[in-house]
């Protein structure tokens, strides 16, 4: 009878009351239980007061109660009916899974975005290529036009100026012919003093030509003596006339490593050169500075002005027709 009464009394007590009584019989405080179970004191207090914290899942609460029962030596089977009331199992709220259609829609949207990105990239690349091709084509047309113009100008100059060098040589030969025949009257010895006076003057003015005439004509020793005395004085004068002039400090020197169209104009507007230069060709131009240059292929020419190389790298990098002006720089006094 006493056993049944005790069992009925235990069933009447709640889970929290039974755990609190068992704890008090063991002489433990709520703080000690909380430290052993690694719980907060407030959680132990809620368990003993049969409270279910709203922020604590029922699964965790049932686990805490079982740990508390093992600590105070209370059989878990006796607490099961009370656990169902104090901490009933609640279905966990599970977020609804995204439907397959939503994932498919998002994937489709990402595909459209990627396609649009590639389309924009292709358009940019295409526009860049078209712009480069137009510039390249325009440069080639400009070079061809300038080459045709220069060829036509060179042909016109050749047709109109072929007689110029011939006239110069004829004039030179005409100037030398009288000079060679002039000393003949001055050779006789028995001429009067009046006729002998102009002979040195004629010989002095035409001393550059007397020497050849004396070398070619075999005359008598008496008649050749006056001319022979004048010959040594004529040699230095003729040698000085043949000596090369000093180099122009404003000379423009160009060496070509490939075929290149070129046009050079000086300060007066005179075209010093206009046409095509072949590989391994050289040009040495002199005019009035500054010079204006148009070069179809800057990479094919090396320019020196006033003894210094001219930098054409900016035109070579952009592959453009070079248009530049070379200004005259003051030369140091010698």
Swiss-Prot record:
InterPro entries: Bact_Cytoskel_RodZ (IPR050400), Cro/C1-type_HTH (IPR001387), Lambda_DNA-bd_dom_sf (IPR010982), RodZ (IPR023690), RodZ-like_C (IPR025194). It comes from the Bacteria. Residues 19-71 form the HTH cro/C1-type domain. Its main location: membrane. Residues 154-241 are annotated as: Disordered. Residues 133-334 are periplasmic. Belongs to the RodZ family. The helix-turn-helix (HTH) motif in the cytoplasmic domain of the N-terminus is involved in the formation of spirals to maintain the rigid rod shape. As this protein is anchored in the cytoplasmic membrane, the HTH motif may contribute to protein-protein interactions to form the RodZ helix, which is localized beneath the cytoplasmic membrane. The C-terminal domain may be critical for determination of the rod shape by probably interacting with enzymes required for synthesis of the peptidoglycan layer, including PBPs in the periplasm. HAMAP family: RodZ. This is Cytoskeleton protein RodZ. It comes from Salmonella heidelberg (strain SL476).
């Amino acid at each position: 009878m006493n056993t049944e009464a005790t069992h009925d009394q235990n069933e009447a007590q709640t889970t929290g009351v039974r755990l609190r009584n068992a704890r008090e019989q063991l002489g433990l405080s709520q703080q000690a239980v909380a430290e052993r179970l690694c719980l907060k004191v407030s959680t132990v207090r809620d368990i003993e007061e049969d409270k279910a914290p709203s922020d604590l899942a029922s699964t965790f609460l049932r686990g805490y109660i079982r740990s508390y029962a093992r600590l105070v030596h209370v059989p878990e089977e006796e607490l099961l009916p009370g656990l169902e009331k104090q901490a009933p199992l609640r279905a966990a709220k599970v977020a609804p899974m995204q439907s397959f259609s939503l994932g498919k829609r998002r994937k489709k949207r990402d595909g459209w975005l990627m396609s649009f990105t590639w389309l924009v990239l292709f358009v940019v690349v295409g526009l860049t290529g078209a712009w480069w091709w137009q510039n390249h084509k325009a440069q080639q047309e400009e070079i061809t036009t300038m080459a045709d113009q220069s060829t036509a100008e060179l042909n016109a100059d050749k047709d109109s100026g072929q007689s110029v060098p011939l006239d110069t040589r004829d004039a030179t030969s005409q100037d030398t012919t009288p000079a060679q025949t002039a000393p003949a009257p001055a050779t006789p010895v028995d001429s009067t003093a009046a006729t002998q006076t102009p002979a040195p003057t004629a010989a002095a003015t035409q001393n550059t030509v007397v020497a050849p005439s004396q070398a070619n004509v075999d005359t008598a020793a008496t008649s050749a003596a006056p001319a022979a005395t004048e010959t040594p004085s004529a040699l230095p004068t003729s040698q000085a006339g043949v000596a090369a002039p000093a180099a122009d400090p404003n000379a423009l020197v160009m060496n070509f490593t490939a075929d290149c169209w070129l046009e050079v104009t000086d300060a007066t507007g005179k075209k010093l050169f206009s046409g095509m230069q072949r590989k391994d060709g050289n040009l040495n131009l002199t005019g009035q500075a500054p010079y204006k240059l148009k070069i179809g292929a800057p990479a094919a020419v090396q320019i020196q002005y006033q003894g210094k190389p001219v930098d054409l790298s900016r035109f070579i990098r952009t592959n453009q027709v070079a248009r530049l002006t070379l200004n005259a720089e003051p030369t140091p006094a010698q």
